[in-house]
Amino acid sequence: MAKFFALKNFTALSDLHPNMANLKIIGIVIGKTDVKGFPDRKNIGSERYTFSFTIRDSPCHFVNVSSWGSEDYIRSLSESFRVAECVIIENPLIQRKDTEREEKFSPATPSNYKLLLSENHSMVKVCSPYEVDTKLLSLIHLPVKESRDYYSLADIVANGHSLDGRIINVLAAVRSVGEPKYFTTSDRRKGQRCEVKLFDETEPSFTMTCWDNESILLAQSWMARETVIFASDVRINFNKFQNCMAATVISKTIITVNPDTPEANILLNYIRENKETNVADEIDSYLKESVNLNTIVDVYTVEQLKVKALKSEGKADPFYGILYAYISTLNIDDETTKVVRNRCSSCGYIVNEASNTCTICNQDSSRLKSFFLSFDVLVDLTDHTGTLHSCSLSGSIAEETLGCTINEFLTMTSEQKTKLKWQLLLERSKIYLKLILSHRARGGLKVTILSCKLADPTEASRNLARQGHT
């Protein structure tokens, strides 16, 4: 089909200046914010509404566009197009931008100007991709920052608190996209959030959180272990609840999906090469918590953990701690206790043994996913103050603790499994834990082991002495 809209028929963003009139601009939408309402100072008791978006018409030129007006007009305009669609803007007002003030909350652009849309005079039309020059459509895969200007996920984790509050760029692949969660704040404002798990060659899992509808909508289109993103200007913070670094999509952020850059292509090849073959990486990514153990410093006794859990009643957030204790129950040689299970390679959940399908991914049995074997062991942890029952020890952490792989374990005789059990039982260990309140768990506390290694006797004695016991 012929291209109806050639770039030469429109004013280029590079040619903008304040005295221009009767403009017609075409561009691809590369970023967009949610609609917001503000008290109208001219009409007390009423509100004005606004949203903004960013358009691009060439590799080097993109501008921010804002619109103010009535709620009906703004919501209708916002809902008429999405990120990655091409739009024609007629009769916008050109204004010189206050770079320092405006780019604090808006995407940084190379232009000295911004566009304002008037409810009475401006118009926005959405173009069909079949009507647009392919050069324009290809811009959606070009990051707005230099392709090598980004942090690897391992660099973010390694830098830790030194990056807290910083705004940086990230190139990563999508590990998983969570379901949007909706909530109401204490002042009755409705909100939403969506957690995206990212990974790259250096880090198996890293959290990026979306708080606005536009980025959540965009994220819902991403394919796990197939989509690569270049996220420009995300905020990095230390997540005190998960004890790790995490990224947040903010109003400055522009996300380029499947960027056409050498660096992104290398990452994409890494995903494809490891998608089916590297089972160990799959196990790590699903079952090994992406928590920097160096950030967990609080030492507890079992009794103290139970008291802390009681004080945290009503809170959904996990807490973390170190426990010097013994593994007092470890049923790995009991034929009636299943300690190795199938997990879904797509989502990491335990496979239903009766149907041999994943109940999370496979409502339709014709869409069977591949599975992998994983340790799934429940252990009791005991110190001088009490016992934590049914603590989860799984995946690669279980392999490290037991000192053997899944395949090695499956070839062991019952006698060998019993010998392995007694090598681990009643040995004082340094154990890193994640704890979360759960009415389904035994004792109301779900405990996940993040690391379990033999304790250094001097270190253990010193910490236990502080608690009045050696």
Curated annotation (Swiss-Prot):
Q: What is its EC number?
A: 3.1.-.-
Q: What happens when the gene is disrupted?
A: Mice develop and grow normally but show infertility in both sexes. Infertility is due to a meiotic arrest at a zygotene/pachytene-like stage. DNA double strand break repair and homologous chromosome synapsis are impaired in meiocytes.
Query: Could you give a GO molecular-function term held by this entry?
Result: single-stranded DNA binding
Keyword set includes Ribosomal protein: no
What keywords appear on the UniProt entry?
A: Chromosome, Cytoplasm, DNA-binding, Exonuclease, Hydrolase, Meiosis, Nuclease, Nucleus
Which terms under GO biological process does the entry name? double-strand break repair via homologous recombination; female meiosis I; fertilization; homologous chromosome pairing at meiosis; male meiosis I; male meiotic nuclear division; resolution of meiotic recombination intermediates
Q: Which Gene3D superfamilies match?
A: Nucleic acid-binding proteins (2.40.50.140)
CDD domains tied to this protein: RPA1_DBD_B
- Locations listed in the record: Cytoplasm; Nucleus; Chromosome
Q: Does the keyword Zinc-finger apply?
A: no
Enzyme category, top tier: hydrolase
- Gene Ontology terms: cellular component: chromosome; cytoplasm; nucleus
Query: Which tissues carry this protein?
Result: Sprecifically expressed in early meiotic germ cells: in adult and fetal tissues, detected in fetal ovary, postnatal testis and liver. In the ovary, expression starts at 12.5 dpc, reaches a maximum at 15.5 dpc and decreases to become undetectable in post natal life. In testis, expression starts at 10 days post partum (dpp), reaches a maximum at 20 dpp and is maintained throughout adult life.
Pfam families this protein is in?
OB_MEIOB_N
Task: Please describe the quaternary structure of this protein.
Answer: Component of a multiprotein complex with RPA2 and SPATA22. Interacts with SPATA22. Interacts with the complex BRME1:HSF2BP:BRCA2.
Q: Which family does it belong to?
A: Belongs to the MEIOB family.
What is the name of the protein in this document?
A: Meiosis-specific with OB domain-containing protein
| Name of the gene | Meiob
